[in-house]
Amino acid sequence: MSDPEMGWVPEPPTMTLGASRVELRVSCHGLLDRDTLTKPHPCVLLKLYSDEQWVEVERTEVLRSCSSPVFSRVLALEYFFEEKQPLQFHVFDAEDGATSPRNDTFLGSTECTLGQIVSQTKVTKPLLLKNGKTAGKSTITIVAEEVSGTNDYVQLTFRAYKLDNKDPFSKSDPFMEIYKTNEDQSDQLVWRTEVVKNNLNPSWEPFRLSLHSLCSCDVHRPLKFLVYDYDSSGKHDFIGEFTSTFQEMQEGTANPGQEMQWDCINPKYRDKKKNYKSSGTVVLAQCTVEKVHTFLDYIMGGCQISFTVAIDFTASNGDPRSSQSLHCLSPRQPNHYLQALRAVGGICQDYDSDKRFPAFGFGARIPPNFEVSHDFAINFDPENPECEEISGVIASYRRCLPQIQLYGPTNVAPIINRVAEPAQREQSTGQATKYSVLLVLTDGVVSDMAETRTAIVRASRLPMSIIIVGVGNADFSDMRLLDGDDGPLRCPRGVPAARDIVQFVPFRDFKDAAPSALAKRVLAEVPRQVVEYYASQGISPGAPRPCTLATTPSPSP
């Protein structure tokens, strides 16, 4: 939503599914004025310290002519208990359309960690200037709420008619604010509409927000609606108010075409004017609830992650008997293939009930005839290529290596097509029961790029994701093309991928990092890809599986 008078409000962020989500609500008090006659137009910019640099992740809307703003735009973040997550809050005056703090617009900042905010729920800190001194008596207050309990979103559309006119030479410029009542009976701003200029019968733009933001997932929680006439000085004229609950809003719009309306009451007029009826009418024209399923909804509903491994055995890896080989089996240090297998597979196996994983090799001559194969079972059992847990994959890899001849070329399409076959059978069920993840470990340039692109485009329409870990120091530019981060991947005939299903990561970027860093990077996109696929097919999660409590046998008599 964008409005030149009320300020710029950015679109809600795209969240990574599967993480805990925290919403931060921000207010400030006693901000420094521009001068004796002019109040600031404040905005708060949130930065997160990540990868050794401060990165902007969110910002509030701009409020005009306000020294003690209460921002309606929530700042949403993913919260990870195992990470420190340092945060900076920069308050600046968005004078003349400024979009970032400058020396002449900077109003102050503060720094803390997300963990500190979450553990205290509410934090009030003084704002500091760039010289480290306090910015007068300016403070910033941050309130944290964890989003939990529901994933419902609400789409609301309001309009009004016959509102009181507050402008002597024109018509009112109405906007509406929505507040929810907190447990301590304080009111929390949850939404502010745009301003509709010069109109006593405004129709505000539809808007969407989470049920948690609207009423803390409590449909009986009181909601307060306040209508104002906008004034550029920041002293908006009060028109009227009314109260409701989300349950009442739902019931009043339950039938198709049904609308709900409230009298907009100014208590001062009601108490003083004998024949006062209302200051206008507000109409709820639309109230729809949208269920947004998460990765955990699907996992808890019975969806299994079917994990398959494909290992590059081409000659470019080097002779395994040499210490310089990428396949060298040193007793002192596991090679990069083994490190990647353990890091990624160790997490994926928790989402597969039988913990049996097909494992294939490509680019090698295999016994007994030593013909080149691009999708052979590394346990040499083509009828049952599955290995017991990741430890079984590693054991099969170690046994396989001395029995094969590394050769070439690096053809990846055959293994993608092989994994796509069961994924296509799964698709035909129309249920969210099994999602395939293929881990490809390779050291070099793909030889069958055209065929691989075609295979990926086909797989993008199936319940399937592909993770490629580049081992060694080769040129991986082709792999980055497959990743699709620079635009949709297309097959040679020009057909685009239905969705981005490939995640490529070079192992060299993580060789000195903890194994968890690699796993976190390569698996980061999988929850989103799972949800995107099933949502695109209109497939809801299964019912949550019932929990079975372990019991202790009674002692024998």
UniProtKB/Swiss-Prot annotation:
Transmembrane segments: none
Molecular functions (GO terms): calcium-dependent phospholipid binding; metal ion binding; phosphatidylserine binding
Positions of the C2 domain: 2-127, 134-263
Positions with a binding annotation for Ca(2+) 2: D167, D229, D231, D237
Subcellular location: Cytoplasm; Cell membrane; Endosome; Cytoplasmic vesicle, Clathrin-coated vesicle
SMART domains for the chain: C2 (SM00239), VWA (SM00327)
Disulfide cysteine pairs (residue numbers): none
InterPro entries reported for this sequence: C2_dom, C2_domain_sf, C2B_Copine, Copine, Copine_C, VWF_A, vWFA_dom_sf
Gene Ontology biological process: cell differentiation; cellular response to calcium ion
Keywords linked to the UniProt accession: Calcium, Cell membrane, Cell projection, Cytoplasm, Cytoplasmic vesicle, Differentiation, Endosome, Membrane, Metal-binding, Repeat
Cell inner membrane among keywords: no
Region of interest (Linker region), ranges: 244-303
Coarse class of the protein's main subcellular location: cytoplasm
Binding site for Ca(2+) 1: D167, D173, D229, D231
Keyword Transferase among record annotations: no
Cofactor(s) for this UniProt protein: Ca(2+)
VWFA domain ranges (all copies): 306-526
Domain comment as written in the entry: The C2 domain 1 binds phospholipids in a calcium-independent manner and is not necessary for calcium-mediated translocation and association to the plasma membrane. The C2 domain 2 binds phospholipids in a calcium-dependent manner and is necessary for calcium-mediated translocation and association to the plasma membrane. The linker region contributes to the calcium-dependent translocation and association to the plasma membrane. The VWFA domain is necessary for association with intracellular clathrin-coated vesicles in a calcium-dependent manner.
Family label: Belongs to the copine family.
Function: Calcium-dependent phospholipid-binding protein that plays a role in calcium-mediated intracellular processes. Binds phospholipid membranes in a calcium-dependent manner. Plays a role in dendrite formation by melanocytes.
Subunit text: Interacts (via second C2 domain) with OS9 (via C-terminus); this interaction occurs in a calcium-dependent manner in vitro. May interact with NECAB1.
Protein name: Copine-6
Name of the encoding gene: CPNE6
